[in-house]
């Protein structure tokens, strides 16, 4: 039972990491799009 719980936690952490990467990528993309407008 403890091993099964650990597996769920491990998968949840992987999912959280993937969502964090996705959010960071979107934020970075928006930053790149906004920067030229501010310079112009």
From Swiss-Prot:
Q: Where in the cell is it found?
A: Secreted
Q: Where is the Albumin domain?
A: 1-40
Q: Which UniProt keywords apply?
A: Copper, Lipid-binding, Metal-binding, Secreted
**Gene3D superfamilies from the entry?**
1.10.246.10
* Expression sites (tissue/organ): Plasma.
- Keyword Metal-binding among record annotations: yes
Among InterPro entries, the record links this protein to: Serum_albumin_N (IPR014760)
In the record, the note on similarity to other proteins reads:
Belongs to the ALB/AFP/VDB family.
Other known facts: In the red-eared slider turtle, there are two forms of albumin, ALB-1 and ALB-2.
Protein name, per record:
67 kDa serum albumin
Native species of this protein?
Trachemys scripta (Red-eared slider turtle)
Where is the organism placed in the taxonomic lineage, from the top? Eukaryota, Metazoa, Chordata, Craniata, Vertebrata
């Amino acid at each position: 039972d403890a091993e099964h719980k650990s597996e769920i936690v491990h998968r949840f952490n992987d999912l959280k990491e993937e969502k964090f990467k996705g959010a960071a990528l979107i934020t970075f993309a928006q930053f790149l799009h906004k920067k030229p407008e501010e310079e112009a």
